[in-house]
Amino acid sequence: MEVVIKISTTEAKKYLLIDTSVLPDVFEEVIQVKELLRSAKVKDITEAVKKVGISRSTYYKYKDYVFNVSDGLKSQKVTISILIEHRRGTLSEVLDKLAQRCCNILTINQDIPINNTANVNITFDISGISGDVKNIVEELKKIKNVLKVEIVAME
């Protein structure tokens, strides 16, 4: 099992990926408690910590600092803003290109076309993509009737 430990500094948060074989068991036990609570296999924290065998104070001490790798790294999201000409099939081509690169579309928001252009914001999961985001953006820019592509946010 791999665990991410959050180490706080005064300037910014710093994360490390550490193999659990070198960590005290308490970190894995905190993860087990969090899993029991998340899956509703127990009714409260008291029951979860008893089942795992740690104290409530130990759980509270580490709960905000220890995460399973899947909690923080499984999904990576990108939001892009695209300015397109109001022409039939343009958005469809954009979506096809994203699908070809194994992007999982999460949201699409298209404004009403004004002066024959429309702004489209697309958020997609990139955890399974082929290639990198910069290449995908460059490919989208090459699509006919796509005027502008920008990365708005990346998580």
From Swiss-Prot:
TM regions (residue ranges): none
Pfam families assigned to the protein according to its UniProt record, in alphabetical order: ACT_4
PROSITE patterns membership: ACT (PS51671)
Domain ACT: residue ranges: 79-154
InterPro entries: ACT-like_dom_sf, ACT_dom, UPF0735_ACT_dom-cont
Top-level lineage group: Bacteria
Family: Belongs to the UPF0735 family.
Entry-linked NCBIfam families: PRK04435.1
Protein name: UPF0735 ACT domain-containing protein CA_C1234
Taxonomic path: Bacteria, Bacillati, Bacillota, Clostridia, Eubacteriales
